[in-house]
Amino acid sequence: IDIVEDTLITLADIKYNFGDTVATLVDGVTKLKSLPNGTKKQDENIRKMILAMAQNLRVIIIKLSDRLHNMRTLKYMKPEKQIAISQETLDIYAPLAHRLGIAKIKWELEDLCLRYLKPEEYEHIKSLIDSKRNERSEYVESFIKTIVKLLHDTGIKGNVKGRFKHFYSIYKKMYEKGKEFDDIYDLMGVRIIVDTEGECYNTLGVIHSHFKPVPGRFKDYIAVPKSNNYQSIHTTIVGPQGKFIEIQIRTEEMDRVAEEGIAAHWSYKEKTKVTKGDQVYGWLRNILELQNEAEDTQDFIKSVTEDIMNETVFVFSPKGDILELP
């Protein structure tokens, strides 16, 4: 990414050796880094980054990967720089990863930001997790064996794996919502991957027939996907020993999109294609419209940030129609 800035190699050299596509991507990412730090100029840099993203989605995927690398090596920088970069990452890059559905990058960025922005809280959460790590791991492994047997007995083929809540998500529950560590419902979880959408609902029936579901903890994102194309069934049940455990049920394709987001469209031999009707592309088109409507750079940044942070709400009308609320 830094080759044009840090070496004698030019864009013309890259174009000659690797073609127009690679040269365009390198140029797009390089331009995002070309302005010096400073409040107004930093706003302008962010504006250019967002517009470059809207025009070529691969630019922002490269940029997100670059920022993740920067965060992983942030310990070598001065404390004030660590805080500034972490705050920018939490404000801009992590929400972007979320909006594009790239969960793996979002989670790691948020956890790394928490380490530098809230070091005491981070260490407290880490100590709580470490204190019973083996006990929780053994519990989840035992529960997975139970689920595997249930699926086998009912003729459902599925892959079952454990999952644990990320540091930043725990931080928000504890410090922003005032919950105790042991009262967080989805601290432990299990993900069930099946072959078809129909089997997702069959699996849900099997789970609810053997374990008591927790009221108000069921969400069907298959019937009503999130705005970033995320699909899955979520339910929390009362497991063995009376412990709450969240279960996510989805197909392999849904799992790939949930983990990789929009990037999944270019992986695995491009089995699926991004279409212009895709919700993510609709959001990107909206960004270009915001640029035209904004009075100045700061107004544009404010509008886009609000749009990035927006959590779309879906409701059912009395007639059963799905409505999207801002």
Question: What are these language model-derived features?
Answer:
Residues 2-189, 193-245, 250-304, 311-322:
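Active-site helical microenvironments for divalent-metal-assisted chemistry
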